[in-house]
């Protein structure tokens, strides 16, 4: 028998959303991808980086992603020393646990939210403590002083879609003895963000991804904003060439084309509000969403029945077996045409 670490042998592992091999034949609304292509500047930047014969691919990329960090800094008003680039924001989440939570030490997060936090903690051998939600969408039983090494707060929350108010997030920062990680994967679709809290609190880290709002899920790009001491610690443990040349070129081009970005996010927000209103007329319970998706429950609260009906029509949404979520589905927001087809299917399914 091979000598796996006991925690690795015991863990189940994270189960990502299904990626059908014949994806073009589906209406794919299950993993919160952007329905629109990335900025045209992205393709130009990739081709320019390839340079015709791709000769640059034989050399390593920038280890520090300096141009990227400067681009993010200019966009959000931070010195590059406050920014670290990552192979998707998941890499930052992983390295935060590696940096702060040793074996047997505690990390916390809200359930339901991103269950990958627990997987990352299990890999490290850290203990996991989950907190539920109250009826008014606050954290149930959060102590006056939370002593865990890290607390992960997904806002806007996935899969539910609501966002925590900024004042409440700041209150949590003052109650965390360790680090408050504000996971803002969906913040670009929301009415506000928590970036300014990094300036006011040394224990706040904000993570972002380009997978959703910038249409770059296939390139794995993310970043974190934190105090320079935190960034320096994360820099010690990341893969030294964590972003390839093409990803770096694509990211810079995408971030610099804010006109295209704003147009795509506006369309998604508008479609989200239209679709939410339409399915409410069918009797669906829909949580007001600040993300690029909605969590919706049919009148009979049988989410699996509706999921199966959509699946049979080659419309793929996300259904969770968790008892807290099984009554509904998370439906990513696609193009207006995709959502009209989904609405028509929901009417047929009943």
UniProtKB/Swiss-Prot annotation:
<keyword id="KW-0028">Amino-acid biosynthesis</keyword>
<dbReference type="GO" id="GO:0000105">
    <property type="term" value="P:L-histidine biosynthetic process"/>
</dbReference>
<dbReference type="Pfam" id="PF00155">
    <property type="entry name" value="Aminotran_1_2"/>
</dbReference>
<comment type="pathway">
    <text>Amino-acid biosynthesis; L-histidine biosynthesis; L-histidine from 5-phospho-alpha-D-ribose 1-diphosphate: step 7/9.</text>
</comment>
<dbReference type="GO" id="GO:0004400">
    <property type="term" value="F:histidinol-phosphate transaminase activity"/>
</dbReference>
<keyword id="KW-0368">Histidine biosynthesis</keyword>
<dbReference type="InterPro" id="IPR004839">
    <property type="entry name" value="Aminotransferase_I/II_large"/>
</dbReference>
<dbReference type="InterPro" id="IPR015424">
    <property type="entry name" value="PyrdxlP-dep_Trfase"/>
</dbReference>
<dbReference type="GO" id="GO:0030170">
    <property type="term" value="F:pyridoxal phosphate binding"/>
</dbReference>
<dbReference type="InterPro" id="IPR015422">
    <property type="entry name" value="PyrdxlP-dep_Trfase_small"/>
</dbReference>
<comment type="subunit">
    <text>Homodimer.</text>
</comment>
<feature type="modified residue" description="N6-(pyridoxal phosphate)lysine">
    <location>
        <position position="212"/>
    </location>
</feature>
<keyword id="KW-0032">Aminotransferase</keyword>
<protein>
    <recommendedName>
        <fullName>Histidinol-phosphate aminotransferase</fullName>
        <ecNumber>2.6.1.9</ecNumber>
    </recommendedName>
</protein>
<comment type="similarity">
    <text>Belongs to the class-II pyridoxal-phosphate-dependent aminotransferase family. Histidinol-phosphate aminotransferase subfamily.</text>
</comment>
<keyword id="KW-0663">Pyridoxal phosphate</keyword>
<dbReference type="InterPro" id="IPR005861">
    <property type="entry name" value="HisP_aminotrans"/>
</dbReference>
<dbReference type="InterPro" id="IPR015421">
    <property type="entry name" value="PyrdxlP-dep_Trfase_major"/>
</dbReference>
<dbReference type="InterPro" id="IPR001917">
    <property type="entry name" value="Aminotrans_II_pyridoxalP_BS"/>
</dbReference>
<keyword id="KW-0808">Transferase</keyword>
């Amino acid at each position: 028998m091979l000598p796996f670490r006991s925690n690795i042998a015991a863990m189940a592992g994270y189960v990502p959303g299904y990626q059908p091999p014949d994806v073009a034949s589906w209406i794919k609304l299950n993993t919160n991808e952007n329905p629109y292509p990335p900025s045209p500047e992205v393709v130009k930047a990739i081709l320019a980086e390839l340079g015709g014969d791709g000769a640059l691919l034989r050399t390593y990329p920038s280890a520090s992603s300096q141009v990227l960090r400067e681009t993010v800094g200019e966009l959000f008003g931070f010195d590059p020393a406050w920014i670290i680039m990552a192979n998707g924001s998941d890499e930052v989440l992983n390295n935060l646990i590696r940096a702060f939570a040793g074996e047997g030490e505690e990390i916390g997060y809200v359930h339901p939210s991103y269950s990958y936090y627990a997987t990352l903690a299990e890999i490290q051998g850290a203990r996991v403590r989950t907190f539920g939600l109250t009826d008014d969408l606050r954290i149930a039983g959060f102590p006056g002083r939370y002593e865990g090494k890290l607390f992960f707060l997904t806002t806007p929350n996935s899969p539910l879609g609501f966002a925590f108010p900024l004042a409440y997030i700041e209150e949590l920062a003052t109650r965390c003895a360790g680090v408050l990680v504000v996971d803002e994967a969906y913040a670009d679709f929301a009415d506000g963000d928590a970036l300014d809290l990094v300036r006011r609190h040394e224990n706040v880290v904000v993570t972002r991804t380009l997978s959703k709002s910038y249409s770059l899920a296939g390139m794995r790009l993310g970043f974190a904003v934190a105090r320079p001491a935190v960034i320096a610690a994360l820099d010690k443990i990341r893969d030294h060439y964590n972003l390839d040349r093409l990803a770096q070129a694509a990211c810079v081009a995408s971030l610099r084309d804010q006109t295209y970005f704003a147009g795509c996010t506006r369309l998604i927000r508008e479609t989200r509000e239209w679709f939410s209103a339409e399915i409410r007329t069918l009797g669906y319970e829909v949580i007001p969403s600040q993300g690029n998706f909605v969590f919706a429950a049919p009148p009979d609260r049988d989410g699996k029945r509706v999921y199966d009906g959509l699946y049979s029509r080659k419309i793929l949404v996300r259904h969770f077996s968790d008892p807290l979520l099984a009554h509904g589905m998370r439906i990513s927001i696609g193009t207006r045409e995709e959502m009209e087809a989904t609405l028509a299917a929901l009417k047929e399914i009943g």
